[in-house]
């Protein structure tokens, strides 16, 4: 079974875009749910189109697949608007101005910064899981 990693981002129209490293597999929508539904539809359409052209399905389709959704930072802040980008930046140890650029999609984070952000985010989630009301 193949895992298809699909990245959720903020689209230029203010909605959501989803992309992968597989050519042609994209989705979009005004909401995250719409974009995911569109992405799944395109995935099936692309497999059918490939079959029409070659009489075989793509490897990722024949072997079975699961979709792992990930966020880029613009998509993360769009999906979770109650998280303040500047405060989150301070928590994860990144310049707040740079984080706001990530949020708006003007700049993409490096692999090193993604790792740093993910590690601090995981720490934050562990801390939040201990909270009781």
List the model feature ranges, each with a label:
Residues 37, 101, 119:
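DNA-binding alpha-helical recognition surfaces that contact promoter or target DNA
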Residues 1-55:
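DNA-contacting interfaces and partner/effector-binding or oligomerization modules
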Residues 1-3, 41-103, 107-112, 126-133:
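Short, charged, surface-exposed hinge/linker loops at domain edges
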Residues 113-118:
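Hydrophobic micro-packing sites on short alpha-helices
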């Amino acid at each position: 079974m193949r895992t298809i990693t699909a990245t959720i981002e903020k689209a230029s129209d203010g909605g959501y875009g989803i992309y992968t490293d597989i050519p042609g597999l994209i989705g979009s929508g005004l909401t995250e749910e719409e974009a995911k539904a569109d992405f799944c539809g395109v995935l099936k359409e692309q497999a059918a189109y490939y079959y029409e052209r070659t009489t075989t399905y793509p490897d990722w389709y024949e072997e079975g697949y699961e979709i792992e959704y990930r966020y880029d930072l613009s998509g993360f802040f769009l999906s979770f608007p109650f998280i303040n980008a500047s405060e989150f930046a301070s928590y994860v140890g990144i310049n707040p101005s740079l984080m706001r650029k990530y949020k708006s999609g003007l700049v993409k984070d490096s692999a090193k910064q993604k790792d740093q952000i993910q590690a601090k985010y995981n720490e934050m989630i562990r801390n939040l899981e201990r909270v009781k009301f």
